[in-house]
Design a protein with these regions (language model features):
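Short polybasic amphipathic segments
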Residues: 1-2
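Nucleotide phosphate-binding/pyrophosphate-handling subdomain across enzymes
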Residues: 8-114
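Phosphate- and divalent-cation-binding pockets in alpha/beta enzyme and binding domains
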Residues: 41, 78, 126-129, 173
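A short acidic, helix-capping loop that chelates divalent metal ions and anchors anionic groups
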Residues: 65-66, 170-173
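C-terminal helical cap/extension that packs against the catalytic core
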Residues: 104-160
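Short beta-strands and strand-loop turn motifs
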Residues: 163-167
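Phosphate-binding loop of NTP-binding sites
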Residues: 172, 183-191
Length: 191
């Protein structure tokens, strides 16, 4: 049988970022279509869908800078997805509890997209050393998340994004990734 292409949505219409999220939308849309849901209903639903909290969650825009909370990016693989989802120059807040991860792949994923790496937590020196070894030197060390958000706000240019996608667990500074993400949102809103 011949396959028919049915346009449902353009990725620019979606409120969620990231190729992995767009692939999930395509899968859900295909299943809904084959279950008999109208193209119009599918389009409306996928265009209204927003990110789950702490997963590349859009927080706000201030002074032309977009802020994203990806606190659930608690390991390098998950945090890579956050970086890949950004479509602007990015100031990346990373670091936290040391789970003995390698950060090389995460740092290599910056690929010219990350302007500054702003580090907090137990892993900040370890990540800084790995980044410098790999040739990334635009690094700022901070005492805590509040300072990191403030530094990012000062360094960011209109059109940039500030992304909390730490590649580390939250323990030591926060009870869990939800608390870390909620604090990030509070600090951003207080700017």
């Amino acid at each position: 049988t011949e396959k028919e292409e049915i346009p449902i949505v353009k990725t620019g219409e979606l409120k969620i970022l990231g190729r992995h999220n767009h692939e999930n939308v395509m899968a859900a849309a295909a299943m809904a279509y084959y279950a008999g849901v109208s193209v119009e209903s599918i389009h409306k639903s996928v265009c209204e869908f927003v990110a789950v909290p702490h997963r590349i969650e859009y927080v706000t825009e201030k002074n032309g800078v977009a802020y994203y909370n990806d606190s659930k990016g608690t390991n390098p693989d998950a945090a890579i997805k956050g970086i890949q989802a950004m479509n602007r120059p990015t100031l990346l807040i990373g670091g936290g509890y040391d789970k003995e991860s390698s950060y090389d792949e995460w740092i290599e994923s910056f690929d010219g997209k990350v302007r500054y790496l702003v580090l907090i937590g137990q892993t900040k020196e370890k990540i800084k050393a790995a980044a410098e070894r790999l040739g990334f030197t635009d690094i700022i060390l901070c005492e805590d998340l509040k300072e990191a958000v403030q530094i990012c706000a000062e360094k960011a240019n209109p059109g940039d994004a500030v992304l909390l996608s730490p590649a580390c667990a939250s323990w030591g500074q926060f009870d869990n990734y939800e608390q870390r993400g909620d604090m990030f949102k509070e600090y951003v809103k207080a700017l």
